[in-house]
Amino acid sequence: MELIIVRHALPESEERNDGPADPPLSPLGLQQAEATADLLATEGVDHVVTSTMQRAIQTGRPLADRLGLTPERLEGLKESDYRRSSYTPVEEMDADHEVIREFMDNPLSMFADGYEAFRDRITAALDAVVAANRGRTVAVFCHAMVVGVYLQTLLGLNDPFTVMADYCGITRVAASSSGIRSVRSFNETGHLRDLV
């Protein structure tokens, strides 16, 4: 089977006092999601999976609508910092931003539940998608750290920050029910040339 793993499109910034931030896509992000659907609509996608976070749901919706599919939402695909009360796209942060300072002091602070728990959660979620979709092509809409840590695990890399996907970057993984995984491509962004 083939996993087509897509990082969500560009979201808005959001700050909340009543719980975790879960921002919607920005106007540019909505255009990126449409461009991604344009590309993937012709690729034989049988099933669409998203994380439970709004930016991933909204990124996957155009493809699901075009294909007449109901997306499956998986809690296990949430981003590593899902508990934060604010979200700012990294491009909008300066060196003094709280998240950047925390990351520079302790890169693993990005993982709300700890790195190992995050790695195990996302790997289990993606393994479950593979097990339930033998012989199918599944588009999975999720987050930068989900993509990065999954690839880090598959490729045997030591640093969870070595591989980072762009907004709507497409990564392809061939996956067999026997457990063999083969990374076929990483961070395809040609469909976004006019939308970055």
Named regions from a protein language model:
Residues L3, R136-A144:
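Generic beta-sheet signal
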Residues L3-P62, F111-I122:
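Loop-to-helix element that buttresses phosphate recognition and phosphoryl-transfer chemistry
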Residues A35-R101, R181:
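Phosphate-coordination/substrate-recognition cap region in phosphate-metabolizing enzymes
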Residues R55, V146-V147:
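Alpha-helix capping/helix-boundary segments
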Residues P62, V149, T153:
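Active-site signature of alpha/beta-hydrolase-fold catalytic machinery across serine-
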Residues E72-R73, S80-E91, A131, R136, ...:
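Acidic, low-complexity terminal tails and accessory targeting/binding regions
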